[in-house]
Amino acid sequence: VASGYGPPSSHPSSRVVNGEDAVPYSWPWQVSLQYEKNGSFHHTCGGSLIAPDWVVTAGHCISSSLTYQVALGDYNLAVKEGPEQVIPINSGDLFVHPLWNRLCVACGNDIALIKLSRSAQLGDAVQLASLPPAGDILPNETPCYITGWGRLYTNGPLPDKLQRALLPVVDYEHCSKWNWWGSTVKKTMVCAGGDIRSGCNGDSGGPLNCPTDDGGWQVHGVTSFVSSFGCNTQRKPTVFTRVSAFIDWIEETIASH
């Protein structure tokens, strides 16, 4: 899986709930997963482009009864800006992790792969995400960014422009404490954020982007769930599927299709 580098200008300032508009095209592996309803397509989840014809998203984003397309190189979903690529998805090309159970989000395995019906054209606005090595665990407080078109606050509106928010990693030792997520969080997950900024509905499936030593970014998480008490509840960080726990499954799935 190729490595993803945003342009240097994409490193966000230190200042998605209580996030801010992203710099346009600064997260060029971010995709919008859209489903068809009454003849038009609607944003439902995020995702990350990990090969020219493969996207990783969350298992809970996929319903076998729906028709999907993926929009790449998008910034403002409401406006045609030029670099967008919209690629249809064939129904047989949705690969949800075999152990995903939508009745048990806390059981983990909330990850899916989507094969595009044609390869994306890579360029400034569309690039491949870099994935971490298998088993890689981020230290506490690693300054990662969630990106997505999720609700701006609990039950709030969906934004048109891609949002980003700084979510420091909360390590498993802290996140699994009884008054945090307790046993709901598993070692195959990553927690990030706290109470002020968080993921929200619509960010699901999108990336947790974490800095690398050489100035690039790696997608360490696939946005999975937030607290039912609200998107920015204290001691309930946003929870992500830990990508480094699923590298083997990702590579095997791509190789066999």
Swiss-Prot record:
Describe the reaction catalysed, as an equation.
Preferential cleavage: Ala-|-Xaa. Does not hydrolyze elastin
The disulfides recorded in the entry are C45-C61, C104-C107, C144-C210, C175-C191, C200-C231
Molecular function per GO: serine-type endopeptidase activity
Residue span(s) of the pro-peptide:
3-15
EC number of this enzyme: 3.4.21.70
User: Where along the sequence do coiled-coil regions lie?
Assistant: none
Which keywords appear in this protein's UniProt record, sorted alphabetically?
A: Disulfide bond, Glycoprotein, Hydrolase, Protease, Serine protease, Signal, Zymogen
Q: Name one Pfam family in it.
A: Trypsin
Q: Which Gene3D superfamilies has this protein been placed in?
A: Trypsin-like serine proteases
Tell me the leader sequence span.
1-2
Family, according to the entry, reads as follows: Belongs to the peptidase S1 family. Elastase subfamily.
Described purpose of this protein according to its UniProt entry: Efficient protease with alanine specificity but only little elastolytic activity.
Name-wise, this protein is: Chymotrypsin-like elastase family member 3B
According to its UniProt entry, this protein's organism is Macaca mulatta
